[in-house]
Amino acid sequence: MALTRLLIKDFRNIEAADLALVPGFNFLVGANGSGKTSVLEAIYTLGHGRAFRSIQAGRVIRHDQPEFVLHGRIDGTETERSVGLSKNRQGDSKVRIDGSDGHKVAELAQLLPIQLITPEGFTLLNGGPKFRRAFLDWGCFHNEPGFFAAWSNMKRLLRQRNAALRQVSHYGQLRAWDQELVPLAERISEWRAQYSAAIANDIATTCTQFLPEFSLSFSFQRGWDKESEYAELLERQFERDRMLGYTALGPHKADFRIRASGVAVEDMLSRGQLKLLMCALRLAQGEFLTRQNGLRCLYLIDDFASELDSTRRRLLAERLKATHAQVFVSAVSAEQIEDMVGEKGKMFRVEQGKITVQSQD
């Protein structure tokens, strides 16, 4: 699977661009602020319905324009698909797939699985549990057909339950919500646990290649006491939840922890080592998807050289090459990506939102 063509209109500082892409490495080289990250963000937005640097649509639409428009052509193993997304300043989205309107953003995500590696990506390791839940949920979304519907319903029921907690006086008034919430919560927790167990070997293998000096362990925490039934816990915790005004325990509090020799990795590893670990997690997840479903991820790597010395850059370059996936890499200079440049690569020069093809000679 590869994105063979990308059209960008009024996205960030890019007025218009029509890019012919290659299945291997696509390099975006330019000074800071030139727009190279905007290209990566456009691809990410086409696959997720939102940008990774801002959740507000108005901030990614070019100045004085009413909307942004993105189109892509995806070359799969047997078919070619066309996808499109537009979003106005009010946040209203239109999704088009193969020429027809009325599709959902989740359908884009299914067609265009993306792994993102940015300088801010350390939050996967040292940020709050929501970032690691998102990591697990990405995997469940692509491996369990019913996950997205169950996850969406669970989020809706939790919002309704939290609103009701501020109004009710006894648990019986919440029972109807919990009768729907509990089976969804248990199913989602089971899917997450199964996925974290299934991918653990992939993560361990990749981490051994990247960080052989550490003995890493992984553990999934479902968000409530593993000895307790969730239905009983919700009833038992009612008074506490009512005082708090929200549901304190459940799958929305799940986490996936990584330790090095028993110590949280964020407390032991250097920033360069944390970046390698983050890359290892993303690569392992992408390779697991390929093995399970035959789909290859797109890898988006912003500011490739950040936090990595030349030895670590070469290591990451070799591992990315081994995936045979499509990779998009941004860098300030061509020298920073010389270990990746090869006959299957294509280089783009980005200057003030203008994108041109640059010879690699």
Swiss-Prot record:
Keywords: ATP-binding, Cytoplasm, DNA damage, DNA repair, DNA replication, DNA-binding, Nucleotide-binding, SOS response. ATP binds at G30, A31, N32, G33, S34, G35, K36, T37. It comes from the Bacteria. Its main location: cytoplasm. InterPro entries: DNA-binding_RecF, DNA-binding_RecF_CS, P-loop_NTPase, RecF/RecN/SMC_N, RecF_2. The keyword Ribonucleoprotein does not apply. One of its GO terms (biological process) is DNA replication. Pfam families: SMC_N. GO terms for molecular function: ATP binding; single-stranded DNA binding. The RecF protein is involved in DNA metabolism; it is required for DNA replication and normal SOS inducibility. RecF binds preferentially to single-stranded, linear DNA. It also seems to bind ATP. This is DNA replication and repair protein RecF. It comes from Pectobacterium carotovorum subsp. carotovorum (strain PC1).
